[in-house]
Curated annotation (Swiss-Prot):
Domain notes: The RanBP2-type zinc finger (NZF) mediates binding to two consecutive 'Lys-63'-linked ubiquitins.
Pfam family, one: CUE
Quaternary context: Interacts with TAB1, TAB2, MAP3K7, TRAF2 and TRAF6. The minimal TAB3-containing complex (TAB1-MAP3K7-TAB3) appears not to contain TAB2. However, it seems sensible to consider that TAB2 may also join this complex and may act in a cooperative manner with TAB3. Interacts with DYNC2I2 (via the WD domains). Interacts with RBCK1. Binds 'Lys-63'-linked polyubiquitin chains. Interacts with TRIM5. Interacts with TRIM38 (via B30.2/SPRY domain), leading to its translocation to lysosomes and degradation. Interacts with ASB1.
Biased amino acid composition, Polar residues: 163-173, 375-408
Domain CUE, chain residue ranges per copy: 8-51
Gene coding for it: Tab3
Protein name: TGF-beta-activated kinase 1 and MAP3K7-binding protein 3
Function summary: Adapter required to activate the JNK and NF-kappa-B signaling pathways through the specific recognition of 'Lys-63'-linked polyubiquitin chains by its RanBP2-type zinc finger (NZF). Acts as an adapter linking MAP3K7/TAK1 and TRAF6 to 'Lys-63'-linked polyubiquitin chains.
Taxonomic superkingdom: Eukaryota
Phosphoserine: residues bearing it: S60, S101, S103, S389, S413, S496, S510
Coiled-coil annotated residue ranges, if any: 521-564
The record's account of how the chain is modified after translation: Ubiquitinated; following IL1 stimulation or TRAF6 overexpression. Ubiquitinated by AMFR via 'Lys-27'-linked polyubiquitination; leading to TAK1/MAP3K7 activation. Degraded in a lysosome-dependent manner following interaction with TRIM38.
N-acetylalanine: modified positions: A2
Alphabetically ordered keywords of this record: Acetylation, Coiled coil, Metal-binding, Phosphoprotein, Ubl conjugation, Zinc, Zinc-finger
Source organism: Mus musculus (Mouse)
Length: 716
């Protein structure tokens, strides 16, 4: 539909469709119409639109930049110290920023003309889950050999006869200015961790080798890579269960020297310019991407091809070597990823060819060996044997090189970055270590360094990360403080502001190593949590045992009290005992009543004469007997009369007794009247003389009829 339009360049449309297969053709054609068939502008626009069709969600460049990791740039350059210009790097090859993965930091290489840039990219084990912010990023397209086996080319290979007709001719010009970078800046917001760089002491004295180490505090925010890039990833011990798709072509790439370009505008290797894909070394696996499909994306000032791990090829004016060392599994030795370095002819013929990945195609006079060993950071408690990723026998001409090394901790390391940790897990601040080459007086300051006839210099650079604190210590600290925060995926970088909407995509498309590392960290976290819960359970069990012991002691005390109460001597009497006591009490009461009645009966018979009863004293206690008081004659006579009158005969009958009692009462009344009349002048005589009780001999008042002491009647 859109290909039939006369306003569209068919070749440019074909190239864009090949690089952005996920974008509909209508969108591509509309973008071409808006940008007037400008391949550079279209690639920038389509790379921004690609994320919408990849993940159905658009991620702004700021979010993507925040999700990437921080960098360490080590610049190795053979150039005059006066030829260092921070803005020359992007003008030499128009290289693009290498985007290792979605969680990588933004790569801001130095704009240096004659330097060798080594960028240490510290990144977690994660495949790109978020589209990169660079305008040339396309995770579905990988340039030729750099294409992963998991993403086969969308179209059949084409012959590398010439560049596309729609390519900007300024791409082949040497110092052409790069396109304007996106509007995000580098933010150094991470704490510093020292990186050890060890330069071998046995450097050849006759060679012009780097002799100074310059550490720059900042790096210009440039989207595009500096001239010539060598990308090295550290080999990671990823889990064998699930490898990242990029590992297949990386493992297949053989070891060996890599062809490079010299710093001359003219073709360096004319005998290899017409190289065909069949000239690849037999050791290299023939992957379907090995044939040249389209001009290498980095040949233009605007890097529009966006392979995930794309080497920055140089422009024609300043070709430079590109060696990409992807992460290889620990089982295989680290390989130098051969990005077929395109050697260019004159700007007029735009012929592009790929150099075979063999040592025989290299000019021996322009080789330099750079050996970079990333030392594993030995952490306490974890035996980490990371396979180093040196550039073994990596010949590079004396021109600017950018070496990007990912100092990724292995997935077996428990100290992977977790958002709950208080400090940044990847505590590597952007540090730029620049090797400046002292030049002789014959070298004039120029953007392009000198070409030395026979340098075979070996740089041995040992890069090691400082030991980070073990996660076990952090877990111990969390035990003391509070409950640990939940584990977040490793792909979610701490401190990133725009990761809320895209961390799920990062986890969904993360590599096996990221999953393995996340699993290890999660297991470590869960193990620490389990230990903490076990301690709490132990304490709770001890408390339970203590409470059980207390309950048992209390029950024992209660039982003892019950036993003491049951065995008490003052027990409640039984009903039988109460009945017996009640009957005894009743019998006593009856006996008392009978005695009283008997006494009353005896009193009614007159004065009781103990002498008349022989056995009277046999029934009472013996005691002193008081003799009767002597009274007057008349009184004695009256008493005798009363005794006679009140004498009761036991043998008399009842009527006789009643008559005698009445007569005795009349006599008594008469005697009382007589006594009162006789004793009236005195109180004593008026009341009468006190009388003695016959039983107890108590002297009672004359008005009383009964004794006060023994209650016996006065007259018996």
């Amino acid at each position: 539909m859109a290909q039939n339009s006369p306003q569209l360049d068919i070749q440019v449309l074909h190239d864009l469709r090949q690089r952005f297969p996920e974008i509909p053709e209508g969108v591509v054609s509309q973008c071409m119409l808006q940008n007037n068939n400008n391949l550079e502008a279209c690639c920038r626009a389509l790379s921004q639109e690609s994320s919408k069709y990849l993940y159905m969600e658009y991620h702004s460049p700021e979010d993507n930049r925040m999700n990437r990791n921080r960098l360490l740039h080590i610049n190795l350059g053979i150039h005059s110290p006066s030829s260092y210009h921070p803005g020359d790097g992007a003008h030499l090859n128009g290289g693009r920023t290498l985007v290792h993965s979605s969680s990588d930091g933004h790569i801001d290489p130095q704009h240096t003309a004659g330097k060798q840039l080594i960028c240490l990219v510290q990144e977690p084990h994660s495949a790109p889950a978020v589209v990169a912010a660079t305008p040339n990023y396309n995770p579905f397209f990988m340039n030729e050999q750099n294409r992963s086996a998991a993403t086969p080319p969308s179209q059949p290979p084409q012959q590398p006869s010439s560049m596309q007709t729609g390519m900007n001719p300024s791409a082949m010009q040497g110092p052409s200015p790069p396109p304007p970078p996106p509007s995000y800046m580098h933010i150094p917001r991470y704490s510093t961790n020292p990186i050890t760089v060890t330069v071998s002491q046995n450097l050849p004295s006759g060679q012009t080798v780097p002799r100074a180490l310059q550490i720059l505090p900042q790096i210009p925010s440039n989207l595009y890579g500096s001239p010539g890039s060598i990308f090295i990833r550290q080999t990671s011990q990823s889990s064998s269960g699930r490898q990242t798709p990029q590992n297949a072509p990386w493992q297949s790439s053989p070891q060996g020297p890599v062809p490079h370009y010299s710093q001359r505008p003219l073709p360096v290797y004319p005998h290899q310019q017409n190289y065909q894909p069949s000239q690849y070394s037999p050791k290299q696996q023939q992957i379907p991407q090995s044939v040249y499909h389209s001009p290498p994306p980095s040949q233009c000032p605007s890097p529009f091809s966006s392979p995930q791990h794309q080497v920055q090829p140089p422009q024609l004016g300043h070709p430079s070597s590109h060696v990409f060392m992807p992460p290889s599994p620990s089982t295989t030795p680290p390989h130098l990823y051969q990005q077929g370095p395109p050697s260019y002819q004159k700007p007029g013929s735009h012929s592009v060819a790929y150099l075979p990945y063999t040592a025989s195609s290299l000019p021996k006079g322009s080789m330099k060996k750079i050996e970079i060993t990333v030392e594993p950071s030995q952490r306490p408690g974890t035996a980490i044997t990371r396979s180093p990723s040196p550039i073994s026998n990596q010949p590079s001409p004396r021109n600017q090189h950018s070496l990007y090394t990912a100092t990724t901790p292995p997935s077996s390391s428990p100290s992977r970055g977790i958002s709950s940790q208080p400090k940044p897990p990847f505590s590597v601040n952007p540090v730029y270590i620049t090797y400046t080459q002292p030049t002789g007086p014959s070298c004039a300051p120029s953007p392009s360094p000198r070409v030395i006839p026979n340098p075979t210099t070996v740089f041995k650079i040992t890069v090691g990360r400082a030991t980070t604190e073990n996660l076990l210590n952090l877990v111990d600290q969390e035990e003391r403080s509070a409950a640990p925060e939940p584990i977040q995926p490793i792909s979610v970088i701490p401190g990133s502001g725009g990761e809320k909407g895209n961390h799920k995509y990062q986890r969904s498309s993360s590599s096996g190593s990221d999953d393995y590392a996340y699993t290890q960290a999660l297991l470590l976290h869960q193990r620490a949590r389990m230990e903490r819960l076990a301690k709490q359970l132990k304490l709770e069990k001890e408390e339970l045992e203590r409470l059980k012991a207390e309950v048992n002691s209390m029950e024992h005390d209660l039982m003892q009290r019950r036993l003491r109460r049951v065995s008490c001597t003052t027990a409640i009497p039984t009903p039988e005992e109460m009945t017996r006591l009640r009957s005894t009490n009743r019998q006593l009461q009856i006996n008392v009543d009978c005695t009283l009645k008997e006494v009353d009966l005896l009193q009614s018979r007159g004065n009781f004469d103990p002498k008349a009863i022989n056995n009277f004293y046999d029934h009472i206690e013996p005691g002193p007997v008081v003799p009767p008081k002597p009274s007057k004659k008349d009184s004695s006579d009256s008493c005798a009369i009363e005794r006679k009158a009140r004498r009761i005969s036991v043998t008399s009958k009842a009527p006789v007794d009643i008559h005698d009692a009445q007569a005795a009462a009349a006599d008594e009344h008469l005697s009382i009247c007589k006594q009162s009349a006789r004793t009236q002048p005195r109180d004593e005589d008026y009341e009468g003389a006190p009388w003695n009780c016959d039983s107890c001999t108590f002297l009672n008042h004359p008005a009383l009829n009964r004794c006060e002491q023994c209650e016996m009647p006065r007259y018996t």
